[in-house]
A protein has these predicted regions:
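Acidic (Asp/Glu) and glycine-rich low-complexity loops/linkers
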Residues: 2-57, 61-133, 137-153, 159-172, ...
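Extended ligand-binding clefts on enzyme/binding-domain cores
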Residues: 231, 251
Length: 315
């Protein structure tokens, strides 16, 4: 193929791409000034009692607002005109589900306004709270209390301060997870690339799984703590696992400060491990090519630390 022909093809492709972008932007801003009006708000008053909550949405943020008093619970939904949600109470469960009436033209353009669902509910003990969203954030304050809380968002963040009795489970793909002030029997947090922050929490079992995001724990008490990460770092401060602490990483570093556990097991591939325990430990530390420096004690709980190329330093 001649050089001129190649250049002409490249120019044509660039022009087609540029024209497509300009067309999309033109369609988007052609109705500039009316975009905000397309966000419609509706308020639904709930007259039936419910003990469980089930929310299944797409791009909406979900926010819980507890209140004291005799007012009826209600839901306020701000959404685009061609997207709607059904709100009803069935068999003691408040169910909010997305109904998508959009056509392909509605997906063209840029929507700056974020849609959201705000649930105003009485302060009481609920049996179950389940929320699923795709790109929306989920926010539950500390005044919300439920035996079971299950939260899932793909790219949205999860911010939970609620009191969970038996189970609190938070799962995201790229969104961050922030949990504080919870006291469930079982706590499960899982993310792919999002960061995890767990603070001021007391639980029986805590299981954390992350891929590339960072994992931070501060002021946490439990009996069993397992933490698994790939390339993300793990940082523990003022964490007490009364029976067992286990941390696995690939390339992520592990730092443990002012923390303690009955038995400790830490394994990394290339990640460094360092820190300080509040009580004496019987260290069994080994690294193939990394530097190892740990206290030479033979008392206290067993602390097994292994790494391939990472350094191991404990004071």
């Amino acid at each position: 193929m001649k050089k001129r022909t190649i250049i002409a093809l490249i120019v044509a492709i660039v022009l087609i791409f540029t024209g497509t972008v300009l067309l999309i932007l033109g369609l988007s801003f052609a109705d500039d000034g009316t975009r905000e009006s397309l966000l419609v708000a509706q308020e639904i008053t709930l007259t039936e009692t419910f003990d469980s909550i089930l929310i299944d949405t797409d791009v909406c943020d979900v926010v819980f607002v507890p209140f004291n008093g005799t007012a009826d619970p209600h839901v306020i939904i701000r959404e685009h005109e061609n997207t709607s949600h059904s709100v009803q109470v069935e068999d003691g469960t408040l169910k909010i589900r997305r109904i998508d009436n959009r056509t392909w033209q509605d997906f063209i353009g840029i929507n700056w306004e974020r849609m959201d669902i705000t649930v105003y509910l009485p302060q009481k003990q609920y049996e179950s709270v389940r929320v699923t969203t795709d790109t929306g954030d989920i926010k539950i304050p500390e005044a919300v209390s439920s035996e079971e809380i299950l939260l899932h968002s793909n790219t949205g963040g999860i911010f939970c301060d609620a009191l969970a009795g038996n189970l609190l489970s938070c799962m995201t793909d790229t969104g961050d997870i922030h949990v504080s002030g919870c006291a469930p029997v079982m706590l499960n947090l899982e993310s792919d690339t999002g960061d995890m922050k767990l603070r001021n929490t007391e639980s029986t079992e805590i299981h954390l799984k992350n891929d590339t995001g960072e994992t931070e724990l501060e002021n946490v008490i439990c009996k069993l703590l397992t933490c698994e990460s790939n390339t993300g770092d793990v940082f523990l401060e003022w964490v007490t696992a009364e029976e067992y602490l286990q941390v696995f990483t690939d390339t992520g570093d592990v730092e443990i400060q002012e923390s303690d556990a009955g038995t400790v097991n830490i394994e990394t591939d290339t990640g460094d491990v360092e820190g300080h325990f509040l009580t004496s430990k019987w260290f069994q530390a080994h690294s193939n090519t990394g530097n190892v420096r740990v206290p030479n004690t033979r008392e206290g709980g067993e602390c097994r630390v292994e790494s391939d190329t990472g350094d191991i330093h404990f004071e």
